[in-house]
C-alpha cells in the first residue's frame, strides 16, 4: 500500500457493549481537529457481509444515509457530516461485503495469478488499499476511521488485522487507536466498575493491538483515581484515559472531549504541531439554544412506518433539533405509527391535540399507506403545518387527488398497479430494472424553484441541489388537474419533467418534497425547509395566522440569480440526470456506480 505522505491515521474501536457512541466520538474528534485548522476526513468500516445497507431493514440497521455521489451508507456518516459540515462519499463507507466482493471479482479475473486467495494477505491488502484510496482523494492531515461492531466480533477481525499491520508499517507517530469502552455505575454499591474495560482491552490485545487512548463512557464523571486505575491495568498513561459521561445532548460531546483534552492528546501522539486554538462560540451557542431555548415549545408529530425504532429517522430527528435551535424553540417530537390512522376508531382531533406540525416520513411498501394519507388529510383540512418527505410527498399527492380533485381511485402504482388514476408511477428508467441494491435514483440532483412560492421564500434561491432515493415519481398527466384545484408545483428538475416540490396555495404551510432535505441539515447550517417548517409550527402554536416565510440569512447560502428558461418537451425515458450547465456544486467522486442516471 502506497501511503500519501504526511497523512496521520486514527482508528476508533469499541468494546464491552454496542451502541456506546463510536460514531459520535469519531465525529466529535473530527470536529475538534478541524476547528484547530487541520484537514480531516472521516469514514466508517462496517463488518457485515452486505455490500451496502441499501436493502437492509430499518429495524436492523436504522436509516440509510445517502451521500451526494449516490452511495447508500451507514447512518454514522450523517453524524460525520452534521458535526464536521463536510460531505462524505462512497469512499467514506466500506463494508466487509464490498471487500470480499472485490477480492472475489479479482480472483475471477485472474489478478492473483493462480495463487490461493486468503484473508491474509489478500483481504487485508484490499482493506489497506481502500484506506489509501481515500487518502489520495484529498489533501488531508488526519483520516479518522471508525470500525463498526464490538471487539470480540468475528466479523471485525480482518479490519483489526489491517489496522495492526498498518501501525507496524507506518510507525506509532503516524497511526493511533482510540478504544471506546463502558464503565458501568452500580447504583447499589455507588461505584464505577472498571473490570469490563479491562477485559475489553485484554481482548483487543489478543489481536495484537495496544490501545493508545481509552475513552471511557460512563453515567457518572470519572475521578482521577478511576482514571489511574484504568491506566494502570490497561497499560495506558493515565493522561490518555479520557472520561465521557452522559450529556444532555450529543452536541455537547465535543465540548466535553475538549475539556478532557482528547484532541490535544491526539495531536501530541501524532506529532502534529501546526494548529490553532478552536473557536467553538457558535457551537456553544447552539448547545445553549438546544438546552435552554427562549422562544417556548412546539409539538411535532412524525407519522411513519418504523416509529418503534427511532434510528430509522435519525437525520429527520436531528434536523428538527437544528431547526428548533434556529427558531430558538424546543421541538417536542411525538412518533406515531402510520397504521394507527387506518383504524376507524382513531380520533385524530383527540390524538393530535396540541400538535403544531405534522411530518410524514419516507419509507417503502404499502403497509400503513392509508394511515399516512389520513394524517395528511387531517393536516390539510385543519390547516396544520405539514412537511412530507419522499413517500410523504407521494402520499400527499394521492390524498389531494382523492379528496380535492375528485379522483377516488387515485393511488401509486407501487401500491395498486391497476389504479385508474395512477398519480404516482414508476420512473421510466426504472421499469426495466430487476435488481434492488443500488439501482434507485440516488444522490444529489438539481431542482429549479418557482418564484413566489413558499419553497423560494425559505431557500432564497432559484437553483438547489438535494439528495434523492426513490423509484417512483409524480405522473405529469395529472399536473393540470392538480393546478386547477390549488396545488403549486414549486420545484422541478431542470428539464421540468420531474416534480420535486409541491405545496398548496391556500394552506398556511403545506410543503412536500421528493428528495431528502434532512440529509443536508447541519448544526450551524440548518436546512431551510426544516427551519421554515418549525417556524410555521411556532406561528401556529402562537396563533399567528400566516407565518413569516423568509429564512434567516445564515440558514441558507447566498441567493443565486434566476436561471435560464427551463427546457421543456423531453421525451419519456430520456436522461433526466444532472446536466453539466445546472451543476451548482461538484459531487465527491465515488468508487462505483450507485444507480445514478
UniProtKB/Swiss-Prot annotation:
Provide the binding site for CTP.
Answer: 18, 153-155, 193-198, 229
Subunit structure as annotated in this protein's UniProt entry: Homotetramer.
- Reaction(s) the record says it catalyses: UTP + L-glutamine + ATP + H2O = CTP + L-glutamate + ADP + phosphate + 2 H(+); L-glutamine + H2O = L-glutamate + NH4(+); UTP + NH4(+) + ATP = CTP + ADP + phosphate + 2 H(+)
The yes or no answer to whether the keyword ATP-binding is present is yes
| Residues noted as binding UTP in the record, renumbered to the chain | 18, 193-198, 229
The cross-references to PROSITE patterns, in alphabetical order and at most eight, read: GATASE_TYPE_1
Gene name as annotated: pyrG
Region: Amidoligase domain, residue numbers: 1-272
Instruction: Output this protein's name.
Output: CTP synthase
Q: Which positions in this protein are listed as binding L-glutamine? A: 59, 363, 391-394, 414, 471
What does the similarity note say?
A: Belongs to the CTP synthase family.
Amino acid at each position: 500500500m502506497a501511503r500519501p505522505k504526511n497523512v496521520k491515521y486514527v482508528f476508533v474501536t469499541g468494546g464491552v457493549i454496542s451502541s456506546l457512541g463510536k460514531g459520535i466520538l469519531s465525529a466529535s474528534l473530527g470536529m475538534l481537529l478541524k476547528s484547530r485548522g487541520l484537514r480531516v476526513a472521516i469514514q466508517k468500516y462496517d463488518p457485515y457481509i452486505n455490500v451496502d445497507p441499501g436493502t437492509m431493514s430499518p429495524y436492523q440497521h436504522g436509516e440509510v444515509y445517502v451521500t451526494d455521489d449516490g452511495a447508500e451508507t451507514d447512518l454514522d456518516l450523517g453524524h460525520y457530516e452534521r458535526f464536521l459540515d463536510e460531505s462524505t462519499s462512497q469512499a467514506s463507507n466500506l463494508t466487509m461485503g464490498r471487500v470480499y466482493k472485490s477480492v472475489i471479482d479479482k480472483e475471477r479475473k485472474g489478478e492473483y495469478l493462480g495463487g490461493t486467495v486468503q484473508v491474509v494477505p489478500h483481504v487485508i491488502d484490499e482493506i489497506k488499499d481502500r484506506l489509501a484510496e481515500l487518502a489520495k482523494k484529498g489533501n488531508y492531515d488526519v483520516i479518522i476511521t471508525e470500525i463498526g461492531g464490538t471487539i470480540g466480533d468475528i466479523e471485525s477481525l480482518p479490519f483489526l488485522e489491517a489496522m495492526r499491520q498498518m501501525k507496524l508499517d507506518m510507525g506509532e507517530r503516524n497511526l493511533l487507536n482510540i478504544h471506546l469502552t463502558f464503565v458501568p455505575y452500580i447504583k447499589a454499591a455507588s461505584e464505577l466498575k472498571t473490570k469490563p474495560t479491562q477485559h475489553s482491552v485484554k481482548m483487543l490485545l489478543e489481536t495484537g493491538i495496544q490501545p493508545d487512548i481509552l475513552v471511557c463512557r460512563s453515567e457518572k464523571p470519572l475521578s482521577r483515581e478511576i482514571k489511574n486505575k484504568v491506566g494502570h491495568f490497561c497499560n495506558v498513561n493515565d493522561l490518555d484515559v479520557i472520561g465521557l459521561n452522559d450529556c444532555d445532548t450529543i452536541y455537547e460531546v465535543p465540548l466535553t472531549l475538549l475539556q478532557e483534552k482528547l484532541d490535544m492528546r491526539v495531536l501530541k501522539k501524532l506529532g502534529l504541531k501546526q494548529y490553532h486554538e478552536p473557536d467553538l462560540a457558535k457551537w456553544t451557542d447552539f448547545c445553549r439554544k438546544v438546552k435552554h431555548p427562549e422562544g417556548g415549545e412546539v409539538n411535532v408529530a412524525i407519522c411513519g412506518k418504523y416509529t418503534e425504532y427511532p434510528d430509522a429517522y435519525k437525520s429527520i430527528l436531528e434536523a428538527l433539533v437544528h431547526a428548533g435551535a434556529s427558531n430558538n424553540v424546543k421541538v417536542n417530537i411525538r412518533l406515531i405509527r402510520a397504521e394507527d390512522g387506518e383504524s376507524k376508531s382513531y380520533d385524530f382531533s383527540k390524538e393530535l391535540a396540541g400538535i403544531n406540525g405534522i411530518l410524514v416520513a419516507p419509507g417503502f411498501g404499502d403497509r400503513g399507506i392509508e394511515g399516512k394519507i389520513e394524517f395528511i388529510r387531517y393536516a390539510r383540512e385543519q390547516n396544520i403545518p405539514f412537511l412530507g418527505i419522499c413517500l410523504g410527498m407521494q402520499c400527499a399527492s394521492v390524498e389531494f387527488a382523492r379528496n380535492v380533485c375528485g379522483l377516488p381511485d387515485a393511488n401509486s402504482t407501487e401500491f395498486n398497479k391497476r389504479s385508474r388514476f395512477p398519480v404516482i408511477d414508476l420512473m421510466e428508467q426504472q421499469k426495466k430494472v430487476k435488481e434492488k441494491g443500488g439501482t434507485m435514483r440516488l444522490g444529489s440532483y438539481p431542482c429549479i424553484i418557482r418564484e413566489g412560492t413558499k419553497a423560494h421564500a425559505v431557500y432564497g434561491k432559484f437553483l438547489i441541489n438535494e439528495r434523492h432515493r426513490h423509484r417512483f415519481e409524480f405522473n405529469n398527466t395529472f399536473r393540470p388537474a392538480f393546478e386547477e384545484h390549488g396545488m403549486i408545483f414549486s420545484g422541478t428538475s431542470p428539464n421540468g419533467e420531474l416534480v420535486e416540490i409541491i405545496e398548496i396555495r391556500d394552506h398556511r404551510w403545506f410543503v412536500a418534497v421528493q428528495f431528502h432535505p434532512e440529509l443536508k441539515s447541519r448544526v450551524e447550517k440548518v436546512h431551510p425547509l426544516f427551519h421554515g417548517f418549525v417556524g410555521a409550527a411556532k406561528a401556529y402554536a402562537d396563533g399567528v395566522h400566516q407565518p413569516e416565510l423568509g429564512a434567516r440569512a445564515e440558514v441558507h447560502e447566498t441567493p443565486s440569480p434566476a436561471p435560464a428558461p427551463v427546457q421543456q418537451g423531453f421525451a419519456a425515458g430520456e436522461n433526466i440526470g444532472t446536466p453539466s450547465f445546472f451543476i451548482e456544486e461538484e459531487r465527491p467522486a465515488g468508487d462505483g456506480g450507485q444507480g445514478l442516471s
